[in-house]
């Protein structure tokens, strides 16, 4: 698994493809995601060692101009973050849930990483801007106090860039909502 990830989110699909090529040529990194996201944006996610990720993201951000939505370099990513992006992390029993919604994928992934590093919660999912108007959201589960802490940490993280849409903690979710949130 990669020690670090880098994310570049752009308002142009063509520019995203161009920069993806430039970033991959600039450093020894792996392409994890290269995808269109709503509404007409483009997302690049790279993995590799921290120095290479920093170089690749610098290459991308320096050439993105006004098409840059957000970027992120995240070293020592928590082991639950990538599985939460590509699917779901399982939760054994119904618990409190917390949801944090952001305006960018990079802000949400950074918030999710900080939340699970600072709280005893399970990061259930990170839904990345596909079919939801370019927004991103994360879902955590655990004891109420831990979920409250995780949501606070994540909200503060997203709020640092002004990219927090909304946050919510549901102490005792209804069974139907629980299934929808944690089972997909």
Curated annotation (Swiss-Prot):
InterPro entries assigned: BMC_dom, BMC_shell, CcmK-like_sf, CcmK/CsoS1_BMC, Micro_shell_prot_PduT
Keyword Signal in record: no
Textual note on the cofactor: Probably bound by a single Cys residue from each subunit; which protein provides the fourth ligand is unknown.
GO BP: any one term: propanediol catabolic process
Use of this protein: Artificial BMCs can be made in E.coli by expressing pduA-pduB/B'-pduT-pduU-pduN-pduJ-pduK (in this order). Enzymes can be targeted to the BMC, and appear to be encapsulated within it. When mutated at 9 positions (construct O3-33 with these mutations; K15A, M67L, N148A, N149L, E156S, E160A, K161Y, R167A, V169L) self-assembles into bodies with 24 subunits, suitable for nanotechnology uses.
Domain BMC: 4-86, 96-182
GO molecular function per UniProt: 4 iron, 4 sulfur cluster binding; metal ion binding
Cofactor annotation: [4Fe-4S] cluster
Regulation: induction: BMC production is induced by growth on 1,2-PD vitamin B12 medium.
Pathway assigned to this chain's UniProt record: Polyol metabolism; 1,2-propanediol degradation
Phenotypic consequence of gene deletion: No visible effect on BMC morphology. Slight growth impairment on 1,2-propanediol and vitamin B12.
Superkingdom: Bacteria
Transport keyword on record: yes
Record-listed [4Fe-4S] cluster binding positions: 38
Keywords from the named record: 4Fe-4S, Bacterial microcompartment, Iron, Iron-sulfur, Metal-binding, Transport
UniProt subunit comment: Homotrimerizes to form a pseudohexamer; in wild-type the central triangular pore is probably blocked by the [4Fe-4S] center. Interacts with PduS.
Protein family membership: Belongs to the bacterial microcompartments protein family.
General remark: Bacterial microcompartments (BMC) 100-200 nm in cross section are formed during aerobic growth on minimal 1,2-PD-B12 or anaerobic growth on 1,2-PD-tetrathionate medium, but not during aerobic growth on glucose, anerobic growth on glucose or pyruvate-tetrathionate. BMCs can constitute up to 10% of total cell protein.
PANTHER family: BACTERIAL MICROCOMPARTMENT SHELL PROTEIN PDUJ, PROPANEDIOL UTILIZATION PROTEIN PDUA
Function statement: A minor shell protein of the bacterial microcompartment (BMC) dedicated to 1,2-propanediol (1,2-PD) degradation. The isolated BMC shell component protein ratio for J:A:B':B:K:T:U is approximately 15:10:7:6:1:1:2. Not required for structural integrity of BMCs nor to mitigate propionaldehyde toxicity, may selectively transport specific metabolites. May be involved in electron transport across the BMC shell. Can be engineered to alter permeability of the BMC shell. The 1,2-PD-specific bacterial microcompartment (BMC) concentrates low levels of 1,2-PD catabolic enzymes, concentrates volatile reaction intermediates thus enhancing pathway flux and keeps the level of toxic, mutagenic propionaldehyde low.
Protein's name according to its UniProt entry: Bacterial microcompartment shell protein PduT
Organism from which the protein derives: Salmonella typhimurium (strain LT2 / SGSC1412 / ATCC 700720)
Primary gene name: pduT
